[in-house]
Amino acid sequence: INDSYKQRVTSNRDMVCLISDIHYGIKTTNAISPYDSDVCKQKMDYLINKTIAFSLENDVDKLYLMILGDEISGLIHNTTRLEQREDVVSQVIEVSELLYESIVKLAKNLPFVVVGLAQGNHSRVMADKKDSLEQENFTRLIKEFLKLRLANISNVLLLENKFDESIIELNIRGYNVIGLHGQNDRLNNLSRLIEMFDKKIDYICLGHYHQSKEFENNKTEVIVNGCFSGD
């Protein structure tokens, strides 16, 4: 789509964009923040346009897009299922297409895009986590869909997770960055997570908590992304 990166004079600037907790398929009708699949698409379009504008304004070499789980509303809560506008199969198909279209739009406008996905709790196949295997997660289907659709786009790299499917590992300009959903981690006790790695972790990016915040934990900067669905 965009081969300009091959002849590009580097600016030594990279950018990270976080997406999490889309909860595609759920419908809420509260007056402050109504949400359904149409609103989701509008929000995604707004985010992608703002990302492109900021990247171009700052002459960014490479965009790292970290998709931090809960792309779909899923099956895990029966009350949530009753609020869903689409069945879970439709959720997977439609959010996969939405993410694909968003990545293509980024690729058309930016030199290079790196995409990583981490699976969350809403995308597990079984409602009860005790009955669910780690690898039985709808995010694997979303990732496979993206892999097939993006295969011939030369300036997009879809990452394979080194540790497991729940953790994205990046090295950005010498900084070690990990991204994950966060359902198994408490914000006030991230030491165990940090100690899992045999290197210094400079940044941890999380979803799950639905409220954006940023703080430091043992010299590691922790960035918690807000909830895409706004609930």
Regions found by a protein language model. Name each.
Residues D3-I19, N30-L148:
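Core catalytic region of metal-dependent phosphoesterases/phosphodiesterases
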Residues S20-I22, G69-I72, Q119-S123, G182-N184, ...:
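Active-site metal-binding loops of divalent metal-dependent hydrolases
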Residues G116, V156-L157, D164:
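Domain-scale recognition of functional cores that engage charged ligands
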Residues E136-R140, K147-N152, N161-D164, R173-D231:
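Conserved beta-sheet core of the metallophosphoesterase superfamily
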